[in-house]
Structure formats: C-alpha cells, structure tokens
A protein has these predicted regions:
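Alpha-helical recognition/docking segments in bacterial nutrient-uptake
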Residues: 1-104, 172
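Short, solvent-exposed amphipathic alpha-helices that sit
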Residues: 13-27, 98-101, 126-145, 191-195, ...
C-alpha cells in the first residue's frame, strides 16, 4: 500500500493530481489508501497512524498541516508535492517561472492595473513564488499592481463568498481601468469568471483573467480560461518514481537510505485560451 494525504477535493488541482497518482497502478501495481485532511495537525497525525497500521510502504503528502521535519520522523519513504519539504523529498512546479509568464502576458496585453488573488501563503511553501514573481515583475515593468491575499475558507461555498467580496471591491476601486487578474488557481479563476458573467453576461474588454494549474475546469469553464499549466501528469509520475525508488531500496537486505532529500522541479507551460487577448 501507498498512503496519500491531500488537503481537499473541491480545488480541482488536487482532484486531478489524485486521478493521475491513482492511474499509476498500471505501472507499479501498488494499491492506495487516501485521506483528505482539512481539520488540522491532530487529525492528520491520526490519519498517518492509521496508514502505518495498514503497513504502508510509502507516503505521498500534498497537505501543508505537518512540517517536513515531523513527517521525516515517521521513518518511511515520503514524497511531498507542492508543499514545504526541507526534510523530505519533493516534486514541485517552477512556480516563479509560471507566475512570471502570466504577469508578463497581462502587461503585454496593456492592462492598466494587475491584480493577484491568493491565500496568505507562507514563504516556505513553493506556491509563495507565484506571489513573489507577480510582485517583482510588476515592479520591474513599473506597472500598478494590487495583491489580495485575503482568501480564506474550508469549502467551495466559503471561498466563493470570499471571491465575490474581492470582485465587488475590484469593481468599486478600479471602475474605468483595464484589469488583468491573475488568480492562484483555476478554481478561483472560474469563480471570478462566473461572477463577471453574472454581472455583464460576457467577458468585457476591460477584464483579462489567468488561472494556474490547467486543471480540467480551465477548459470546461463558460469561456476556456488562460492558465499556467502545471504538468500534473508529469508531477504525479515523478513523485511515484521518487517514492518507488525509496521503497525498493528499503526492501534490500542492507538498504541505503537517501543521504539527503531529492527535490525535483517541473517546468510549467502558459496555455493561452479565451480570457486573454
């Protein structure tokens, strides 16, 4: 068995990543035990104890609840995906490059104000580089920008309410300007796009929207959304390769554990669709 711990399934990125990880069964023939961890460290530790009681051989972690130092103490092969991973092996997207591509496109499309919408990401988390790249690129090109890190919520509806509040603020604050909106993920981007359609019945020329992930919702939206494509299939495949290598090593008579964690970074691809010029 391999254990998987994900934060939730309402963000389309996580559900797509889970789909890709589960599809690796045909290559490796490992069965999976999956927990969704939304309620803090105590719950997650309980899940890990339960997974260990099933004698899992390895663990893939996407949630941010426990530190990599705590996770490394369990003494089993672990790979993190898109989270803080100082003490364990990991696979991440080059978040800086992805956000740089998105921000540059909005600048090239002559938006008057660039706005980034996200949660308040900790600096140790790889996705913080999306915020950093957005800010640094706007400053380099001397473009006015606004960073809103106020998104909070533990359900789709709670987050939608937050995005609605932010949309109202943007409408009031920047009424006569072309707005380039770069959102933390495709789920947020789809919510924002739907709010625009509810108000205007179309995507007006004074809005451009870019998401992040290229999860299925980006192409299924009312207008296909321009997005920074994380190569989710390659991330999942790389994570499985890293984990299985560690697990196979553990089975040897005298196993040699990794001297230090292995960190792999996957290049993102900007996918231009209908929400940018």
């Amino acid at each position: 068995f391999i254990g998987i711990i994900i934060p939730n399934l309402y963000l389309h990125y996580y559900s797509e990543m889970l789909t890709q990880l589960l599809s690796s069964y045909s290559d490796y023939h490992y069965k999976f035990l999956v927990f969704s961890s939304e309620h803090g460290a105590e719950e997650e530790q309980q899940y890990i104890e339960e997974l260990l009681s099933y004698q899992i051989e390895g663990l893939i972690v996407l949630s941010h609840t426990l530190s990599s130092k705590q996770l490394s103490s369990y003494q089993i092969p672990i790979v993190a995906i898109e989270r803080e991973a100082e003490h364990i092996s990991s696979v991440t997207t080059d978040n800086y490059m992805g956000a740089l591509q998105a921000t540059t496109l909005l600048i090239r499309d002559k938006c008057d104000i660039l706005i980034h919408i996200n949660v308040n990401v900790e600096k140790a988390v790889p996705a913080y580089d999306r915020i950093r790249a957005f800010k640094e690129t706007c400053e380099e090109y001397q473009v006015p920008y606004d960073i809103d890190l106020s998104v909070i919520g533990n359900s789709y509806q709670e987050i939608l309410n937050e995005i609605r509040r932010i949309f109202t603020r943007i409408e009031e604050k920047y009424p006569n300007q072309k707005k380039g909106i770069f959102l933390a993920n495709d789920t947020y981007a789809n919510m924002f796009l739907n709010l625009i359609f509810q108000k205007y019945r179309e995507l007006p020329s004074f809005y451009e929207i870019i998401g992040f992930d290229n999860s299925p919702i980006a192409s299924e939206a009312i207008l296909p959304i321009t997005t920074v494509g994380q190569q989710i299939d390659i991330i999942a495949q790389t994570a499985m390769e890293l984990l299985v290598q560690q697990m196979e090593e553990q089975k040897k008579r005298s196993p040699k554990p990794l001297e230090k964690p292995v960190h792999k970074q996957i290049t993102p691809i900007l996918i231009r669709r209908n929400t940018t010029s």
